[in-house]
Amino acid sequence: MLHTLMNEAKAVVVDIGGFTADYLLMNNGKADLSSCDSLENGVILLYNKIRSRGNAELDLLLDEGDVDAILTGKQTQYPPSVVRLVEQLAQEFVNDLFSTLRERMLDLRYCTVVFVGGGAILLRRQIEAYGKVGKPLFVSNINANAAGYEYLYRLEAAGR
């Protein structure tokens, strides 16, 4: 995947984690540190919103495992109304995140977007359904960040 990004005129890496969603713009394979930030848009906010609305509107006590099962398309015992609510709120979460990125002058329609992090894996269907991401790539390895840091460490250590 690194070779793919090196040949792209413009790419954005979006890491959707528990507490934050981080992004980094890459131009011609090089990080543009003037266009990177950490947004307080992690999936824990989504879990809390789903649990709150589920309790208020449907008198349900959903936990994170329930939400994960619904969002990953696993068979659950929940009625269609619960599944619809969870998927609707997840789609709104993704739409809001991408609107925030657009406000920061990142138009995802015309670039490669690499999605990493557990939140990106969880929300893959909603990200793909958004329909305004030019070329989405998903890193499904939950340990990709650690592997990347290990790679950078080895490069740094070899240079000493």
Predicted feature locations:
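Short glycine- and Lys/Arg-enriched binding-loop motifs that mark or flank ligand-binding interfaces
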Residues: 13, 38, 113-115
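Aspartyl protease active-site motif detector
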Residues: 14, 41-44
